[in-house]
């Protein structure tokens, strides 16, 4: 960042969001992004759109940013409104500006091991696993969830260091028993507290990708909203060798990877 600033290069992240729910998981992510950007001297510009925005409106904004030579980094928060095809919108992001790595061209490059802007959440998961010091070669790694920008890229990335990878979903038969055999367990199913202690091999590395805002009893006869993951942290924590927290785990690491990609995109855009 300092070298870019010294050369007069402005690093900015343009983020598009379409929701009216100020308590959504996407807005939690937005707050983390803005805070981290400000701390690092990266300009953050949020393009807030209505939760009822249609494809033409959202696509038009993304195309405008993609074609703007002064814009070097673009991301689109999911989910988009139900009627909007996220694949089509993500395909409109210029690959060189796609700092979340969600354009189909960037995702495809993962399979071939080509250098590109890779999906941030998948990168964050890999960095967290690396931080534990575990040698993935020959280890059993199980991924719960097979979304196009999280589960599938993570599975492919785990294959590079020669882990034995099993890609599953919440409907996989005998899933708890399969999970208990895994040395590394990644929960990315989008189901609050799906993974319990019975799923976890003692000492396993468990990465919780999920983030949900749920209502719980506040102890005073009412309810309150709290943030939880796909893992039941209370039961899994004592069993796992490592459990990434929610909040405070994959979320901040994903923001860090996003900003790493943002700086890389700004550098590549330099004449």
Model-predicted segments: where are they?
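Charged, compositionally biased N-terminal leader segments and the immediate start
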Residues: 1-20
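Glycine-rich phosphate/diphosphate-binding loop of Rossmann-like nucleotide-binding domains
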Residues: 23-35, 116-205, 209, 214, ...
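Short glycine-rich anion-binding loops that position phosphate/pyrophosphate groups of nucleotides
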Residues: 77-83, 191-193, 211-214, 249
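Rossmann-fold NAD(P)-binding glycine/threonine-rich loop
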Residues: 86-107, 207-270
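Short beta-strand elements in bilobed, periplasmic/extracellular small-molecule ligand-binding domains
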Residues: 13, 37-51, 165-167
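Anion-binding alpha/beta catalytic cores of soluble intermediary-metabolism enzymes, centered on
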Residues: 3-5, 9, 72-136
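Short, well-structured alpha-helical segments in soluble
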Residues: 57-69
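Short beta-strand segments
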Residues: 17, 75-79, 144, 208
């Amino acid at each position: 960042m300092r070298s870019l600033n010294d050369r007069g290069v402005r690093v900015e992240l343009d983020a598009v969001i379409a929701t009216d729910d100020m308590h959504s998981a996407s807005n939690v992510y937005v707050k983390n992004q803005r805070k981290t950007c400000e701390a690092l001297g990266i300009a953050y510009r949020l393009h807030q759109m209505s939760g009822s925005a249609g494809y033409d409106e959202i696509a038009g904004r993304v195309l405008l940013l993609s074609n703007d030579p002064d814009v070097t980094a673009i991301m689109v928060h999911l989910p988009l409104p139900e009627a909007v095809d996220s694949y089509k919108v993500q395909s409109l992001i210029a690959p060189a500006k796609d700092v979340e790595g969600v354009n189909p061209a960037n995702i495809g490059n993962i399979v071939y091991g080509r250098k590109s802007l890779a999906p941030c959440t998948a990168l964050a998961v890999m960095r967290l696993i690396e931080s534990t010091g575990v040698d993935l070669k020959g280890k059993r790694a199980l991924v719960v969830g097979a979304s196009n920008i999280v589960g599938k890229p993570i599975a492919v990335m785990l294959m590079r260091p020669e882990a034995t990878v099993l890609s599953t979903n919440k409907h996989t038969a005998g899933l708890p028993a399969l999970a208990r055999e895994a040395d590394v367990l990644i929960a990315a199913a989008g189901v609050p507290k799906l993974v319990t202690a019975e799923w976890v091999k003692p000492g396993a590395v468990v990465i919780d990708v999920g983030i949900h805002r749920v209502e719980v009893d506040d102890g005073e006869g009412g309810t309150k909203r709290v943030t939880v993951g796909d893992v039941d942290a209370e039961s899994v924590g004592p069993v796992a060798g490592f459990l990434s927290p929610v909040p405070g785990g994959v979320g901040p690491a994903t923001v860090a990877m996003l900003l790493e990609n943002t700086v890389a995109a700004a550098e590549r855009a330099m004449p």
